[in-house]
Amino acid sequence: MTFRIGPHEIGTGRCFVVAEAGVNHNGNAGTALLLIRAAKDAGADAVKFQRRTPHAILTRAAYDRPYEGPNSYGATYGAHREALELSDAAWRSVMDTAAKIGIPCFASAWDEASADSLIALGVPAFKVASADLTNTPLIDHMARMGVPLIVSTGMSALAEVDDAYAVIRATGCDQFAFLHCVSTYPAEPAMVNLRVMETLRQRYPGVPIGYSGHETGLAVSIAAAALGAAIIERHLTLNRAAKGPDHAASLEPDGLRRLIRDIRNVEAALGDGRKLLLYSERPVRARLAKSLVVAHDRPAGHVLDVTDLVAKSPGSAIAPRYRS
């Protein structure tokens, strides 16, 4: 199973790198546009945001719950979440800017109204957040919209991933991927368990499997690429020290650029598995490898045998493996 997001085909071997801007714009349209440009400049294949309708996804008690702290943008949790949303006009500017500079832009839709508005804006894909993996009515709604789904599997059991898989397939959707994810911020390397990617590959044959990382640093995501992640998603911020819920577990633009550089180097290093004598190795082999030479002077007519031969550099003549 492969599918396309913009010019990129997912599931063909090249890792699709998503810069998750999320709500790291802090509700500011100008910051959102800067994040798009930062993602493009870093070499990301796509940039992703989040869209939610807070009053639709929170109970009244949850909406009105006092929410004070260093990362709060409102006196209540609902007000905080509202403050982190972009306006319709800002969303149009986001999509227009992404199209203009040539980077696919999509979003996590946290409710059906958000999904509908994103489709109207022309998103080329949806992300299903880990928080909605068990929200199968929402998954069903998005799977019927004719664009690919990228589904995160954080804070879930395997049986719940099975349920999401069944719901997606029942709609006829065959363009989707699962991302292994650990929903702690930040995730410690010992928690990450990257081998789950192979578990998911075996359980859902043909489905592209990737990794959504919330760890600090680059090593875990680079390891995911080495283990064959079809997609890698990392949060992007302009400043890790900024106020907001996700900045501390995000990469700044230079960190994202270095991550993408290293992922591409890993892909190049993995190669095709054929063992060959490389053209670039031949001068080194000629200089350092060994050839068969006669150990001592022998008279004319002497018939050489193996006791007369030793291996010495350079390696430009008969190899010692032909000694006998």
Q: Where are the model-predicted features located?
A:
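Catalytic cores and adjacent flexible loops of soluble metabolic enzymes
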Residues: 1-324
